């Protein structure tokens, strides 16, 4: 009985740590509640967040700058990892977008643009062993 309880608590801890590392917020606003973000994730981003999905065979590095000039804490998205969500809710309201930069692990720029909230940025395989970016707005 104790073994089942320990195994269950380990699974819950692992699941919560995966959830926490896939949600990125403004460095000045560490609130856990983001208005506009769905309670249960569907297959698209909420209106106040940007979703980044890596479906390529390459690891990518994501960085950016929020509207107020504060940099996003850079993070890596590994090949076929679960989606990452960048919250645009800070200073008490939802911001329109941010400058987003996505580079390959070797430093080659894949995407550099101002990205609006509610956008899904999908990194997909391209040609032999490269990657390209596809955008969808919901």
Regions found by a protein language model. Give the residues of each.
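Intrinsically disordered, low-complexity segments enriched in small/polar residues
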Residues: 19-138
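Sec-dependent N-terminal signal peptides
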Residues: 5-14
């Amino acid at each position: 009985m104790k073994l089942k309880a320990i195994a269950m608590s380990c699974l819950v801890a692992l699941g919560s740590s995966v959830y926490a590392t896939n949600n990125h917020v403004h460095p000045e606003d560490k609130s856990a509640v983001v208005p506009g973000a769905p309670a249960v994730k569907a297959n698209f981003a909420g209106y106040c967040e940007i979703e980044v999905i890596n479906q390529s065979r390459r690891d990518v590095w994501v960085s950016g700058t929020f509207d107020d000039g504060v940099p996003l804490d850079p993070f890596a998205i590994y090949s076929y990892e679960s989606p990452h969500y960048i919250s645009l809710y800070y200073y008490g309201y939802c911001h329109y977008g941010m400058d987003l930069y996505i580079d390959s692990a070797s430093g080659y720029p894949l995407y550099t643009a101002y990205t609006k909230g509610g956008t899904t940025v999908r990194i997909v395989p391209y040609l032999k062993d490269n990657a390209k970016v596809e955008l969808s707005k919901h």
